[in-house]
Amino acid sequence: MPHFRLCFSRANCRKKGNSGKHTNPLLPYGYIKDPKDITKLYVDEELRPVVELIYKLYTEEGIGRKKICDILNSKYNYPTPSVYYQMKHLERGRIYKHPVQKLWSTYMIRNILENDVYCGTLRTHKKKTVSIRGKAIKLPEEEHFVFENHHEAIISKDTFNLAQEIRKRKLNT
């Protein structure tokens, strides 16, 4: 099976997702695939400090997403998700066809802060495609398949929950 194809059919992909296997070819920032089993996630030790720093700045120091972007862009030399994926593609001799954003954005920070994959949870079946070439529709959270303690966490569940509380508080003010 080619390493870039995780599922050959929608039914096969759904079956793997139902059984707790990671089926998305794009990995969450901070994780790598197991070379022997591409459906398993492992922490990328090179990127662990970036994710930890983002959560620390947001939860412990009370810094907002925009300020976190400014800090990452000026003080640290951490690659953005798209720059990192491009580097990994080039290392393997492949072409990265997606647009590359060299500076951190609030959107990237939000994606990291809102994704429970960082506390060891795998969530599958988040979207559904209605027709063959149709647009994917987001499904309600009740329909997601959730696998707690699926892989090694970068941050604790408590830290993740605190980040969600802070986010909700900021939305309500």
Each model region followed by its residue ranges:
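Conserved catalytic breakage-reunion loop centered on the nucleophilic residue
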Residues: 1-173
